[in-house]
């Protein structure tokens, strides 16, 4: 009975997942989770360093197509969506995972740093969601999952562009959901807490800051990328068909303190 329930509500068999930034950190964890759940994958990466991720997917007997693109380029975004449909015929799940961060005090922040972060973290999310939602509307269904942050709720320090972009991601998640829910397209977001990735390595290396973070997390540990696997499958599967515009914090309790 449990196996039937799991298959009915959480299986992604025969689903096509389009994932950006899927060859490292949390993106790689999402990709592996999708492969475990039976989805076929179209993975957009900034570089061609995807051999390790490819092996992880193949270990799950999954099918993955890797596509290199610069997500600051509107035309390359458009072409990536066209290529996915050309290969698979459809897109059932979009995960806007690709992101970047630039750290510097506000008074020293450079214009190009601001633009770089907003282009990847916000503009690419908008363009991809717009392009893919048109396909999902024709299909009659779809899931769009954005990646928010604890800094979708807080101000942060020394990361003004990142904070602005992640507040905006939370906002457009709700805005998109308002328009797309009636088309059977669910738009939601995951807000990861403090996760062990390359982006957070400088913080973890700062003994004082690391202790401050751990002292605030009720779970008393940094998340591992695999801690996010369950949430991404939930939002990508039938189990979340009546969930719209929600920002799901997976944070070990960070926000409740």
Identify what each model region corresponds to.
Residues 16, 23-24:
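Conserved glycine-rich cofactor-binding loop
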Residues 109, 155-163, 175, 200:
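Active-site loop-to-helix junction immediately N-terminal to the catalytic Tyr of the SDR YXXXK motif
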Residues 129, 165, 173:
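Active-site helix of classical SDR
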Residues 181, 186, 243-245:
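Short, small/polar-rich loop/turn modules that mediate ligand/substrate recognition or access, typified
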């Amino acid at each position: 009975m449990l196996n039937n329930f799991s298959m009915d509500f959480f299986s992604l068999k025969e689903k096509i997942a389009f994932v950006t930034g899927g060859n490292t950190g949390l993106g790689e964890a999402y990709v592996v989770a999708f492969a475990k759940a039976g989805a076929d994958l179209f993975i957009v990466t900034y570089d061609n360093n995807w051999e390790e991720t490819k092996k992880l997917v193949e270990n799950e007997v999954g099918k993955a197509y890797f596509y290199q693109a610069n997500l600051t380029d509107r035309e390359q975004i458009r072409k990536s969506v066209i290529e996915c449909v050309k290969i698979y015929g459809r897109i059932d799940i979009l995960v806007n995972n690709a992101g970047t961060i630039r750290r510097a005090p506000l008074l020293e922040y450079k214009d190009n740093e601001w633009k770089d972060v907003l282009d990847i973290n916000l503009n690419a999310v908008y363009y991809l969601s717009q392009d893919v939602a048109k396909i999902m509307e024709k299909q009659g269904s779809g899931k769009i999952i954005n990646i928010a942050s604890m800094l979708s709720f807080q101000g942060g320090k020394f990361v003004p562009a990142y904070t602005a972009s992640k507040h905006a991601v939370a906002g457009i998640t709700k805005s998109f959901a308002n328009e797309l829910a009636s088309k059977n397209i669910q738009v939601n977001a995951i807000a990861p807490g403090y996760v062990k990735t390359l982006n957070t390595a400088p913080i973890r290396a700062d003994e004082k800051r690391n202790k401050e973070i751990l002292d605030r997390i009720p779970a008393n540990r940094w998340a591992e990328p695999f801690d996010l696997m369950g949430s991404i499958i939930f939002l990508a599967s039938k189990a979340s068909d009546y969930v719209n515009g929600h920002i799901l914090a997976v944070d070990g309790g960070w926000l409740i303190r």
